[in-house]
Design a protein with these regions (language model features):
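Low-complexity, glycine/alanine/valine/leucine- and proline-rich hydrophobic stretches
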Residues: 213-242, 251
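Short acidic, glycine-rich loop/turn motifs
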Residues: 197-204, 237-239
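One-carbon transfer enzymes
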Residues: 1-190, 195, 240-243, 249, ...
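A short acidic-to-branched-hydrophobic micro-motif
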Residues: 202-217, 243-246
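Intrinsically disordered, low-complexity regulatory segments enriched
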Residues: 179, 200, 205-207, 265
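A general secondary-structure junction signal
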Residues: 97, 198-200, 213
Length: 273
């Protein structure tokens, strides 16, 4: 069977002989008692689920969270993915006080990070992680010294949100523009991957596109057709072609179009759906 492995956070905590609590229910009395006994000044939360008030309100100064966007924009579960899907040129990280609502507490500090043309969700995640730890330290120092003032979020319905990724919102919509398709692919790479139904040799299946480039060129091909040109795979669009550089077929590994074509053939009627 598969062996359970501890997270890197747990492994580091164990190396420093720090107490580790892993309750099934965050409201259970034993867990609350353990936290209370710590007499903590503040809790720091990163990449965790919503905490109940009985937990985040325990410390003297409350609890702070690190969020991977410039709040109030992109509140929600998948901010890194959605800034790329929406074609943003910049994003950032925010520390804020936790309150009753998701990602809505008073802002403490923010750090802006530029988004490069070649960034995908994986590379942007790494950029933000690199900036995150120093921002948390600066936030804690500011709270400790009393020099850091928080400010309430100005939340309106017009702010972009970052809902949880699902099969529905990660599917490629082929009526979109080429840049919208490329942005979605970047925003969902390496995980979970932008996907589409396709038909080849009369059989339908699902594929994922992990990397693509846009080619703006007039053509007379039917839309959504899969074309093979040499060792490249193109999908036709009203603006030109989507050059699919890395693809993953069902039950296969992610691979380059050249590698894929070494053992897989698309017929003349192949298309995305």
């Amino acid at each position: 069977g598969k062996k359970l492995t501890s997270s890197s956070v747990k492994q580091l905590a164990e190396s420093f002989e720090l107490p580790i609590f892993q309750p099934i229910n965050l409201k259970e009395s034993k867990f609350i008692s353990q936290l209370t006994e710590l007499k903590a000044d503040i809790f720091v939360v990163v990449a965790f689920r919503m905490l109940p008030k009985v937990v985040w309100s325990l410390p003297k100064f409350g609890s702070i969270n690190l969020h991977a966007s410039l709040l109030p924009n992109y509140r929600g579960a998948a901010p890194i993915n959605w800034v790329l899907i929406n074609g943003e040129k910049k994003t950032g990280i925010t520390t804020f006080f936790i309150d009753e609502k998701i990602d809505s507490g008073s802002i403490l500090l923010q750090k802006e990070v530029s988004i490069d043309l070649n960034d995908n969700a994986g590379s942007l995640h790494d950029k933000l992680v690199y900036q995150g730890a120093p921002l948390i330290i600066d936030t804690l120092k500011g709270i400790q010294s009393g020099t850091l003032n928080s400010r309430k979020q100005n939340i309106t319905k017009s702010e972009f949100e970052a809902p949880k990724l699902s099969a529905e919102n990660t599917k490629l919509e082929w009526g979109a523009t080429l840049i919208m398709l490329k942005n979605k692919i970047k925003g969902l790479c390496p995980y979970p991957g932008a996907w589409s139904f396709f038909e080849n040799n009369g059989i339908q299946g699902r594929l994922k596109i992990l990397k693509a480039e846009t080619i703006y060129e007039k053509h007379s091909h039917p839309l959504n057709k899969i074309l093979v040109k040499g060792d490249e795979i193109y999908i036709t669009n009203r603006e030109g072609y989507l050059n699919c550089i890395e693809i993953q077929l069902p039950n296969k590994k992610r691979m380059s179009s050249k590698t894929l074509l070494n053992g897989y053939k698309f017929d003349s009627n192949a298309r995305v759906l």
